[in-house]
Structures are given as structure tokens and as C-alpha cells.
Amino acid sequence: MSKAYEQSGVDIHAGYEAVERMSSHVKRTMRKEVLGGLGGFGATFDLSQLNMKAPVLVSGTDGVGTKLKLAIDNDKHDTIGIDAVAMCVNDILTTGAEPLYFLDYIATNKVVPEVIEQIVKGVSDGCEETNTALIGGETAEMGEMYHEGEYDLAGFAVGAVEKDDYIDGSAIQEGQAIIGLASNGIHSNGYSLVRKLIKESGIDLNDDFDGRTYLETFLAPTQLYVKPILALKKAVQIKGMNHITGGGFYENIPRGLPEGLAANIDTQAFPTPNVFNWLQQQANIDTKEMYNVFNMGIGFTVIIDKKDVAQTLDILKQEGISAFEIGEIIEDKDTPIHLEGVE
């Protein structure tokens, strides 16, 4: 049976080896609330151990987009899993939820145990940094669905927040401050354009760029904001949060704003990493479009009362994150976001 299955394009033994290789990485992500071990039909998590009065579960799912193609083409698979985790946990974090567990899905042309191990290592690194248990996953070998060497990666995260602490933006008011947390580069959006520009420019990805190679710059993993935001939440009343992903500033910052309010952003209040200047020069596009595609150096925003700005910046600095007061909430019924220095 297994021989016939292998002849049809599925290598069971390679799958077994991949599971064996990834197990040590997965185990280091475990939390005390996880019941049972690896390999069950369903993964279990004991919410009662969180000692929450009225827990609200928050879930999110996402992928890494065509950044995967850049990783695959350059045989660099050990950090792309961090991106998968970050795209999910940063999203659910905007509600004030603490990420609890994560599941991954890898679909590939052919299971290569060494590659699968590197992918899952990255996922585990992201989970370990955010205290999120990698509680389950699926690796699917589908030769007829993908070209040789190709794979896709997606993730699913679940977190919890006390019902009374749930952040939905309803407490946002005119005059409150917007704090921007620095990104780690491009993160995981806009890579169809990025890859096009890499090809057209003819650069050698191993050449130096701004203190590291081009490849390291383009594959720098998405920043994880869980630890600094959870630390901030203990000290400051957060009114709203946004994860700056696809659609850049224009699509993400207005999300969750009450009707009649808008965000006024000073684009001179934070530094723009050189990689975005390079992309803009290569693409020959205007600055407004850049802010409509990329994070431009700000990967996450927090809305707080003005009186809490100094304390917020201090806490985030202690947590190792560069942060800036980048704007404020204003009254505007027509235009949900204004970018000073761009428009």
C-alpha cells in the first residue's frame, strides 16, 4: 500500500522524518495549559488555568504572501515561519488578547524533511518569543498542486482577553495620541512589487545594503509586538491598536475609528528605513502610494490619552522597541486619515 502511495507521488517516510525533525522545535513552545502530547487527532488547551473571569477568545489566520517565493528561490527557510506567526498574533493582539496557541499549515510539492524542519523552526521561534504554544499543524504533500521546490505556509492563532478589557476602538476620542512602533523592515506585504523590482534592478542579493545583505534586508522577519504591548497594557489604558499590514497606513490606521473621527499623522515624526527609499526609487512611484502599500517604518500603532505618552514611550523602550508619537485623533467626518508631509 505504502509503495503504491509513494509511486503516486507521496513519500510517507519523508513525512515521518519531517515530524521527527520538527518535534524538538515544537516542544519548546509548549505552555502548561496544553493537555496531552504531540500527534493527537485534536490539540487541547485548558482555559481554566488562565484564571480569567470572563475570557473572550480571539482568533486570526493569515499567510506570508509572495515573500515565500523570495525565500524559496534563495533556499532560505528558517525565518519565514516567524512571519507566519507574526502576521497572526499581531492581528489578534489589536484586541488586547494574549496569544495562547498557534497551528500551522504547510503544503508542498514534495516533503523534504530538512526544509520542513527549517520552516517549523521559524514558526517555533516566533511562538517561543510570544509564549504561544505551537499546538498542532498539517504538512500536506501535493505534487500535482505545486511546482518542484515550492510550498505554501499559513497559520492560525487563538488568544484570550478578559471581556471587560476587550479593545474595540469605541473608547477612542478626539485629542488622543497615536504612538507608532517601529517595524523591522518590509514585513510581509508588498512582495509582488518587491520581487519585481529585485529582478528589474539586477542587484546581487548577497551584496551589502545598509549594514547587511540585500537578501537579509528583504527577508527580515516581521516584528513581533506581543511582549511589549502586553507589558504596556498592564500600565496604560490603551484605547485602540492597529497592525500595519497590506494597505499600509491608509487602509489600516483608520480601522476601528469611531464615526466622525480621523487620524492625523506627522510622517516626519519617525524615520523611514532605507529599504523603502530604495523601493521607491526603483519603482518610481510617489510617496502617497508608498504609504498605501508599505508600513514605511511603523508596523503597529497604539492610541492612548495624551497624559500617557511619556510613560508609554518609556515602557516600550524598556521592552526593546523603538516608538514615536506620530500623530493624534482629530474630528473629521469625510477623510479618515491625513498624512502631513505626504498630501
Swiss-Prot record:
GO terms under biological process: 'de novo' IMP biosynthetic process; adenine biosynthetic process
Designated name of the protein: Phosphoribosylformylglycinamidine cyclo-ligase
GO molecular function: ATP binding; phosphoribosylamine-glycine ligase activity; phosphoribosylformylglycinamidine cyclo-ligase activity
Superkingdom per UniProt: Bacteria
Cysteines joined through disulfide linkages: none
EC number assigned by the record: 6.3.3.1
UniProt keywords, alphabetically: ATP-binding, Cytoplasm, Ligase, Nucleotide-binding, Purine biosynthesis
Gene Ontology cellular component terms for the protein in this record: cytosol
Gene3D superfamilies: PurM-like C-terminal domain (3.90.650.10), PurM-like, N-terminal domain (3.30.1330.10)
Subcellular location: Cytoplasm
